[in-house]
């Protein structure tokens, strides 16, 4: 089906590729963007054909074919121009509802501090690699001693001595088990509050029943996606449209339609940025935000160039935070407030876009290969970093369009007024806030 759609709309896709290359400094459309555009062209084509046919009610336009072509051209240009394509994964929908399915791998058994259901590996990142996890498949059991100095043996086969790590010296020592559930060291002091690893000669793989061997397994989860409509109406006077055509040589109805579609595109990009911004705020701890708060006030004896270039340290710290959370990802884009641009101009590795094409949020340049965008929804000094990979599992969010730009019939009233509606249908969802982190530049 996908290949058929790409072939069916190959001519329109070539036009879209040429438009993107011309207006976005030679940028090429990704295969996912091309497929998304083809699916939306097909959805829009079928919608217009069905909704404006003779059974439902004939359109008032003289040339239905020309108007349909115009609407498809709007889709062809609007979809590839969205910066949402660069900030989140775009998943076209062939129905107004769908879901994202993914797997995560969890522990199926208890072994020391590793409990049944603990996540080992997920599409969103790896689980915590602590001392207990390191020894999950070994003969060693790692378990936390309670405040009372007692612990419950994880397996009935485990008996005998205990190897524990001294919290002060960080050395491993040997303790002796007592019948009352306590362990004492060589000085007969109760071992408490330390991470311990205890083993026994009886704890061998070939001595354990198969059901007791440490095991992991998959768990499938779903994220629902339901497309919701966004609508806008355009109204104008019939005589005004006539004067525009005869006196100035342009079609007012198409001009207004393009403006309406531009407004829809502006809102889509802004809504996606707002979703990511809120996700970054929710996913960033106080300590992380404090580490990513940078003052542009010049220290005594330091030039503006040297100090502003130090903002790179904050960017690298943000990258490290996302990597430490997931153990597998780095951010590849940054969204900033407009007043951060003067700082970026001083940062080594920043390359500005020469011919900026903007409709609300826009791409301003690159910083060491990381795309940088400006959005009017960002408050003064705000910025956040995020990741948009090649699939939903490596992206912070998803934009799932169902209908790109679909029109209603053009209606006329007795007083000469003309009215028409335009709508877009799409779903969106925040997938992984661990792929987002926010910071701030203060005075």
Place the predicted regions along the sequence by residue.
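Extended assembly-interface regions of large multimeric machines
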Residues: 1-141, 149
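Beta-sheet entry/capping signal
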Residues: 64-68, 97-102, 231-233, 328-334, ...
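Acidic/polar, low-complexity extended loops/arms that serve as protein-protein interfaces
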Residues: 75-80, 95-136, 162-270
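Short alpha-helical segments and helix-capping/turn motifs at coil-helix boundaries
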Residues: 80-90, 180-184, 216-220, 317-321, ...
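Sequence/fold signature of self-assembling virion shell proteins
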Residues: 125, 202, 206, 215-258, ...
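Surface-exposed beta-strand/loop patches in extracellular or lumenal glycoproteins
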Residues: 146-160
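Alpha-helical scaffold segments that mediate packing/assembly in large oligomeric complexes
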Residues: 236-238, 251-317
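Extended, solvent-exposed, turn-rich assembly/linker loops in the middle of proteins
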Residues: 286-357
